[in-house]
Amino acid sequence: MTVEYRLAPEFPDPYPVEDSYAALVWIAEHAADLGDQDRILIVGASAGAGVAAGTALLARDRSGPRLTGQLLIGPMIDDRDRTVSTTQYEGMPPWDRNSNRMGWTALLGDRRGTDDVSIYAAPSRAVDLSGLPPAFIDCGSAEVFRDEDVAYASALWAAGVQAELHVWAGGIHGFDFMTPDAAISRAARAARDGWVVARHLSSR
């Protein structure tokens, strides 16, 4: 199912994650009619992957529906603008440091980069990642989100959470959407599909 959560700046934090969590609760309550209640996977790309990661944290902290996995494609998860990759690709399309600041400001307003930011809005701020569902994280090597995504995967491993990380050589942000027939895009889709099948669709 696709969740049409409300978008910033008209609906800033916490609307996107709260909408996504409400949808997750509804899906879990109707899982018998929709599919398998024991195999609920959350997926997102870019800002949507940040919402997915935040929703996974919220589900854990509210003892909400159990997720079997989180598939995060180029997730936007850190508002603090401190990594090497945020400066390394400044001025380079399709999404650079200025775009990133604009996006975070739309979501957080004047709170961007301050201590007054929730882990559900910016999951990289979470200190405790234990108890989260297994994760698949990928990004391009030539994108702003690279370092925060690698750091998040490392933090998941440190917390004892199963995670699979792919950094696609030469990939820019959204490379698989812009060049779907390129070899790198086909490889990325195959890796994602393989993870979903192996962990969530195979018979138990």
Language-model features, listed with the residues they occupy:
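Alpha/beta-hydrolase superfamily serine-hydrolase fold, recognizing
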Residues: M1-R204
